[in-house]
A protein has these predicted regions:
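Intrinsic disorder at enzyme termini
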Residues: 1-11
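C-terminal helix-coil-helix/basic helical segment that borders enzyme active sites and/or dimer interfaces
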Residues: 25-36
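Internal helix-loop-helix
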Residues: 47-118, 161-171, 182
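A short, Trp-centered hydrophobic/proline-enriched beta-strand micro-motif
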Residues: 118-127
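Active-site-adjacent elements of ketosynthase-type condensing enzymes
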Residues: 130-139
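Flexible, small-/acidic-enriched active-site or ligand-binding loops
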Residues: 138, 198-222
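A structural signal for short hydrophobic beta-strand segments in well-ordered beta-sheet cores
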Residues: 141-144
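A short core secondary-structure module
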Residues: 149, 153-204
């Protein structure tokens, strides 16, 4: 079995490395000081297809495979970890992909083109104040049906992109228990917008490192 890089992968690595070293690396101190990734960098990443890159082309993504996504994350991380893990890889690539695979067509049409163009943020909200790894044993956020709507009650903590989602718009894929008797099958993801959402109260935390993206939490219905 041949594990060497394909020519396409080599070109992709060189392209992302060149962008990261020329555009991102000189801005690292400014990113850390301002605790924000400049909009021009986000837009440049969008033009290169680095935002939610695993999303299908139908919704504006690059539709790259996971090897290509990991190559991009590695090269971005050489310049600044804020862009490599929370934005490009962990949040945008992974959860953009999950949403594109399991979300409704209407919701995907509404949010994904804005995410891939850098005009909205998509994040994940699973961790809670009492735990994040043992979700089955610690998750207390619940959701119940009320008419045609769902009502969520609970709190999420240590969530990437709280400020970005609140300012730019977008969604956090939020895990809630919908059936207390169904074990691990009793959970569902809900697309929760933070911008202009008066039913959600957000909080912010101070990070040590990866300063370019916010970390915080939000409470629903409490």
């Amino acid at each position: 079995m041949d594990f060497s890089w394909t020519e396409e992968q080599k070109i992709w690595r060189r392209t992302v490395r060149d962008f990261a070293q020329k555009k991102i690396k000189p801005m690292v101190r400014e990113i850390d000081t301002n605790k924000k990734i400049p909009e021009n960098i986000i837009k440049d990443m969008a033009r290169l297809g680095l935002l939610a890159p695993t999303v299908s082309k139908e919704y504006g993504g690059s539709e790259v495979d996971w090897t290509m996504a990991c190559i991009a994350a590695e090269e971005l991380g050489r310049a600044d970890i804020s862009l490599a893990i929370p934005v490009m890889y962990l949040v945008e690539a992974a959860w953009g992909y999950i949403f594109s695979r399991y979300g409704t067509h209407e919701m995907k049409e509404t949010y994904l083109p804005k995410v891939t163009s850098g005009d909205a943020f998509i994040g994940i909200a699973v961790t809670e104040p009492e735990g994040g790894s043992d979700i089955l044993g610690t998750a207390k956020t619940t959701a119940f049906k009320k008419g045609k709507n769902w009502v969520l009650n609970g709190e999420k903590m240590f969530i990437s992109g709280v400020t970005e989602s609140k300012q730019m718009g977008g969604i956090h894929l939020t895990l809630a228990r919908t059936d207390p008797d169904a074990g691990h099958k009793g959970f569902s993801f809900f697309a929760v917008p933070l911008k202009h959402n008066h039913n959600v109260k957000t909080t912010l935390l101070e990070d040590m490192g990866r300063m370019g993206i916010s970390t915080g939490g939000f409470a629903m219905g409490l």
